[in-house]
UniProtKB/Swiss-Prot annotation:
Domain UVR: 196-231
Name recorded for this polypeptide: UvrABC system protein C
Species in which this protein is naturally found: Bacillus subtilis (strain 168)
PROSITE patterns in alphabetical order: GIY_YIG (PS50164), UVR (PS50151), UVRC (PS50165)
SUPFAM superfamilies in the cross-refs: C-terminal UvrC-binding domain of UvrB, GIY-YIG endonuclease, RuvA domain 2-like
Length: 590
């Protein structure tokens, strides 16, 4: 911990508020809230933590805090700060999942539409529905039952819906407000759970039509009843009061939290939302933050009632959301809460089981790879790849896999310094020499296996440096590719021989992941260097633009393409003197 952090920790107040953790670049990486700032912020730097929290702590170089007058104010501020900074460790709602609704528009001649965007307008929203297909099926049923206008713009003549009996044709006929109001009330009653009453009314009309020998009309009514049954009675009833409510419950273990949300609409459990994310503060406070973000960030429709566990501050949620919040002690509502909690525990258990299986597969693949190469299990693998285009901007990259998983913290990039032109052998010698000279000098861990993404020449070049220059005894293998640039074989030994691996084995898949990753890392670095080089060359020989200003322009525009799209004024605003800006602008336009 640096001196500045220690001094700031000593000055933390005994008050509620929010804290913003920052990395070396002063980027906000995590936002949290606390009832007592001093206790919460200090807890990150004392005691032991799980792996995920420890990873966060290792990146913290600075922090700031904002004192609030209450816990509720801290919760609201935390939500706003997360929305503003989008910190990488506040990941609970990154996917922004939204659900579809059926909207009854507030127009002279109302329409029914399916939408995911709930606005504060005068329209009536019904939902959410589990998916867009369910919403469209329900709308299609309502279109059959109630002849509302379908067209977004009123046409000059009647459309097909009028001839099908699904529209009253307000485009050419004078439809009274009373008629529209009756249709709106009927649809509202239907969507609020009164479809059984509608079905009963239709059955009475069907029997009446049959008695009057109006068989076509009776058949039409029978079909409408069948559509209601097939569309609306797929869900099992869970409540009898038909109140729209959301049920929130959570479980946490091993540094992870799972929140389950049950959507109850018109007495039915129509859908659930599952969110899983790392836990960096107290579970009940993280849960409060989640609920606040759930409705503000994801544009979810606020129901009439919300159910939460009794461990949560009920009044704070009520003040935040301005809706009814209940903590049931018994009965059907309590059973719903317990069911949501049970599902959260199951989801966490499944996640940990999958992690364990993945680790077993990864470790098993590493062990099998060692057996295939006749070496000790290569727990630590370091892989190298070169990248250049006809010898220009040559670079190399090294990646690290530990127990079959990428360890990106130890990835390294290299600009080739001693080689000119397209010399992959010389480049490999330089990079391997630089890497392991430093490893020996700084007493860093040596790999159990070195993998070279290249042909025999590069493998032998790396071996020569490792064995003859540095006197190390590390197994070196090479990845051979087929004509489609896919992993085909593994080369090892002196002289090099093919180590045969089953194409569908876990160890072969591990090699593919290593080859793909080191190639991706090297290529992305080369593109970055090439882009900077192109940028620099455009700026060469322009009076008034030196190295410092070149770096400033690169940071401002990012690429030559964006700089070419810029106006003269844009270039001046980037801090370039008028004369130099004119010269640069003229050069870019050629």
């Amino acid at each position: 911990m640096n001196k500045q952090l220690k001094e700031k920790l000593a000055l933390l107040p005994d008050q509620p508020g929010c804290y913003l953790m920052k990395d070396r670049q002063q980027t906000v990486i995590y936002v949290g809230k606390a009832k007592v700032l001093k206790n919460r912020v200090r807890s990150y730097f004392t005691g032991s933590h799980d792996a995920k929290t420890q990873r966060l702590v290792t990146e913290i170089e600075d922090f700031e805090y904002i004192v609030t007058s209450s816990n509720l104010e801290a919760l609201i501020l935390e939500m706003n700060l997360i929305k503003k900074h989008d910190p990488k460790y506040n990941v609970m709602l990154k996917d922004d999942k939204t659900y579809p609704f059926i909207k009854l528009t507030h127009e002279r001649h109302p329409r029914l539409i399916v939408t995911r965007n709930v606005k504060k307008d005068k329209g009536r929203y019904f939902g959410p529905y589990p998916n867009v297909q369910a919403a469209r099926e329900t709308k299609k049923l309502l279109d059959r039952l109630y002849p509302l206008r379908k067209c977004s713009k009123l046409p000059d003549r009647v459309c097909l819906y009028y001839h099908l009996g699904q529209c009253l044709a307000p485009c050419v006929k004078d439809i009274s407000e009373e008629t529209n109001r009756e249709l709106v009330e009927s649809i509202t009653r239907f969507l609020r759970g009164g479809y059984n009453e509608v079905k009963k009314e239709l059955e009475e009309k069907m029997h009446e039509a049959a008695e009057n020998l109006e068989f076509e009309r009776a058949k039409e009514l029978r079909d409408q009843i069948a559509h209601i049954e097939s569309t609306m009675e797929k869900q099992k009833m869970t409540m009898n009061d038909l109140v729209d409510r959301d049920v929130f419950a959570y479980a946490y273990d091993k540094g992870w939290m799972c929140v389950q949300v049950f959507f109850i609409r018109q007495g039915k459990l129509i859908e659930r939302d599952v969110s899983m994310f790392p836990l960096y503060q107290e579970a009940d406070e993280e849960f409060l933050t989640f609920i606040g973000q759930f409705y503000s960030k994801n544009n979810h429709f606020l129901p009439k009632e919300i159910l939460v566990p009794d461990s949560i501050d009920q009044s704070m949620i009520e003040q935040l959301l301005e809706t009814n919040v209940h903590q049931p002690k018994k009965g059907p509502k309590k059973e719903l809460l317990m069911l949501a909690h049970k599902n959260a525990k199951i989801a966490l258990k499944e996640k940990f089981s999958l992690i364990e299986r993945d680790e077993e597969r990864s470790i098993g693949a590493v062990q099998k790879l060692g057996e295939a190469l006749n070496i000790y299990t290569p727990h630590r693998i370091e892989a190298f790849d070169n990248s250049n285009i006809q010898g220009t901007n040559p670079v190399s990259a090294m990646i690290v896999f530990i127990d079959g998983k990428p360890y990106k913290k130890e990835y390294r990039k290299y600009k080739i310094k001693t080689v000119t032109g397209p010399d992959d052998y010389g480049s490999m010698r330089e990079v391997v020499r630089r890497r392991y000279t430093r490893v020996l000098r700084e007493n860093l861990p040596l790999p159990d296996l070195i993998i070279i993404d290249g042909g025999k020449g590069q493998i032998n070049a790396a071996r020569d440096v490792i064995e003859n220059e540095l006197g190390l005894d590390i197994p070196i293998a090479g990845l051979a590719k087929d004509e489609k640039h896919r992993t085909s074989n593994l080369l090892i030994g002196d002289p090099l021989e093919v180590a045969y691996l089953e194409r569908n084995s876990q160890e072969f898949y591990l090699l593919q992941r290593i080859q793909d990753e080191v190639h991706r890392f090297a290529i992305s670095f080369h593109r970055q260097i090439r882009g900077k080089s192109a940028f620099q060359s455009v700026l060469d020989d322009i009076p008034g633009i030196g190295e410092k200003r070149k770096k400033m322009l690169l940071k401002h525009f990012g690429s030559v393409k964006k700089m070419k799209e810029a106006s003269l004024e844009d270039i001046k605003k980037a801090g370039v003197p008028a004369a130099a800006a004119q010269l640069l602008y003229d050069k870019l336009q050629k």
